[in-house]
Structures are given as C-alpha cells and as structure tokens.
C-alpha cells in the first residue's frame, strides 16, 4: 500500500508538473503572441506616424516655398510700383520746371491760335500764374480774340493750364499732371523694359 500511495503521490506530482508545464507553455505562448501583436501594432502606428510626419514636413516645405515666392512677387511688384511712382514724380517735376511764365504765355497763345475765333473760351490757371500772366495774357489775347476769352483761377492746378469752351463741350488739359501722365504712358513700355528682371 505504501507503494501505491507513493505511486499515487508521484503520479499527482507528475500530473501537476505536466499541467503546470502545459499552463506555463500556454501562458508563454499567449504572452509571445500578445507581444508580437503589440510589436506589430506599434510598428504599424510608427509607420503611420512617420508617413504623416513626412507629409506634414513636405506640405510645410511646399507652403513655405509658395509663401516665399509670393513674398518675392509682392516685393518685385512693390519695388516696380515705387520706381514707377518716383519716375512719374520726377517726370511731373521736370514738366513743372518747364512751365515758366514765358512758356505758359507762348503755349496759351498757340493753343488759342488754332481754336475757333468765334468760341467763348475759359482759360484756367493756378492763382500764382494768374498773378504773373494776367495782364500780359489779357493784352495779347484780347487784341487777337476779343472779349470772348476769360482767364480764371483754378485751385486744382499746380502748374500749367486748362482750356475749355464756355458751354463745356470741349476741354483740353495742359496741366503738368496731365502732360506727365501722357508722357508716362508713352514712356511706360520703355520704362518696363529698363526695369525688367527676367
């Protein structure tokens, strides 16, 4: 009986050890499978994060380049506009410097020479030019054209003059601003060639 108990104890031990080994192997296998699943999931998430980060970096670089190009275009346009403005201002100053009293008197008389003798005409000058030219012009003009011509002050004129039929149907602008604008439009294509950056 003693052998039977001993055999029974050995058998229980052996069965317990076998069961423990089986459970242990099963736990280890499950742990390995879970670890592999966790590793695969982590690798997949890492790959997705890497792809997302690379896309964000690419997009950021692309947007930065686009913003840089736009800023450069804006700078070029702004510089071109500033240069045009300076050029136009210099042109206006040059035209204004030519408009002295003698030149204005000659120009007004020549314009009136080609105008119809029967027209009622208003000549508009700035106040300082009226003070300088009024008596000379009135004498020259009235002798040729009679009393149908009036010389009037006009605050909107810096240098130069405007000539208008009294009924308002015909109008010529010989102000320094208008002449500078005409010259600028004529010179603008050449000016663009000079400052062209290509």
From Swiss-Prot:
Any GO BP: proton motive force-driven plasma membrane ATP synthesis
GO cellular component, one term: proton-transporting two-sector ATPase complex, catalytic domain
Keywords, sorted A to Z: ATP synthesis, Hydrogen ion transport, Ion transport, Transport
InterPro entries: ATPase_E_C (IPR038495), ATPase_V1_Esu (IPR002842)
Function: Produces ATP from ADP in the presence of a proton gradient across the membrane.
Entry similarity comment: Belongs to the V-ATPase E subunit family.
Protein name: V-type proton ATPase subunit E
Organism: Borrelia duttonii (strain Ly)
Gene name in the database record: atpE
